[in-house]
């Protein structure tokens, strides 16, 4: 059985994936943004391998999340599920970053770099990433007029590019991105066409399945099928330059080569 860490797993797709994996006998480590959210997981607290707490908007707390997970032990897989949707204003994290960038892009990058390397990485993206622009010179929206829909789309482009970059940087790790579809969650709303079980299937499958179809890397998935992502996400120069920029923004360096 595998041990899986899932960010943003107190509700929505993250919680659904956790329940699905627990029901299959796997060990799951949950993540809650606050102690209040963690305390609400009373029905799962005795079943999981751990619950880590920290707000991904904060770089300091993201470092602490990585420390908490590493203290539990190496994960077999990590599902980077946490994300926020459109915000009407740029906002400002404790480090001065745009909220969407911090949670959707910087946090998964930092956790990937700071946590002990797993065998599998799964990054939740969105079909909306195709409407994102690279804009590596202004990732943090300090120069452009704020556009919440564009900021979200860009953040989801970033994680696809990150997944593909890691497939090259760490060839022994299976690194993939997933579009779960517009699912009926607190974020997606009650009118969304995809039920929550279907929405969590692909990322859960990629995290643990030994089927040959799941033992691949550098792919973009939608409902158990590989799809073609935005051309920019597949551009090697864009991937490389994006990672350089993320390292500059966070002060965190992504390790290279084989697992230490």
Stretches found by the model and what they are:
Residues 24-40:
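Conserved glycine-rich Rossmann-like NAD(P)H-binding loop of the short-chain dehydrogenase/reductase
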Residues 177, 193-240, 244, 248, ...:
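C-terminal helical subdomain
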